[in-house]
Amino acid sequence: VTFGVAKPCHLLPASEAAVGRLTIIDIGLDSADRTAVVERLTADDVAAAWPVPTAASDKYSRGVLGVVAGSAAYPGAGILCVLGALGTGPGMVRYLGPAAVAALVHVHAPEAVTATGRVQAWVLGSGVDPEDTDDEDQVRWIRQALDSDLPCVVDAGGLAFLAPRTAPTLITPHAGELARLLTRLAGPGESEVTREDVLDRPGEHAQAAADALGAVVLLKGATTLVVSPTAHGRPVRSQADAPPWLATAGAGDVLAGILGTLVAAGVDLVDAASVGAFVHGLAADRANPGGPVRALAVARRIPWIVSGVLAGLYTG
């Protein structure tokens, strides 16, 4: 139980596990003129931020997402990323990847387009091995997207190609990936950042990456953090909407697709990361409440979660 408003210790990874069920008692404090340090979105916030089409919308105005994901070693990543994107409600998804993976994508998602063309945002790197040079086209597509002025959601193997860019950039590492990224950005001769370092001080390391790259960082974990560059002056976002069962292979690929659709629709990166994490977590919870959940089941549940959020079925 706390009074007035939630405190940072109630919402941040280092201490949230000890909080249990949080009850906030209103004691009449006026916090309207105070700037939050940490924010957490509710279902009502998510509904307000969600991009809803109108009668005047077409597939291009709703957002066309390009996806460079999946590989011979990890074909499922391409499929799951595309399904996550499609379930979130894009105008179109263009998939670029190995021909064998593209064929599998078409089996699971015949509406996906496997040809180049205009896009409004990219998802890059899910299931891509940066050390595998067999598919030169895929590496070229990732580099070209990062060199463009289009918004990019960069996940997994795509992080190995990332340098500071001026275009909108959202990265989605887990602790190990963030450690490797920070070590690379620091350069030779600097101390290695380890996964344990990130887990001990997640907010600090996410902030370091955000400042170094000029990017929004979604650091995945039991409590997901969304951190923007210090110069932007925005509070940290903290979402803890997913069950522990979501710690499973492919879940991050689905999340990357969700985020890509939101970014292609023009949603602000911090909002896209936060509402995407909320819907991803709730989809996992509702796919099989209280039990194991597959990433594919999460992807298939997304449209129902979105409609439920917009209908006000999940209060708060």
Q: Model-derived features: where do they sit?
A:
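Small-residue (G/A/S/T)-rich helix-start motifs and N-terminal tracts that mark the onset
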Residues: V5-L170, A175, R180-G316
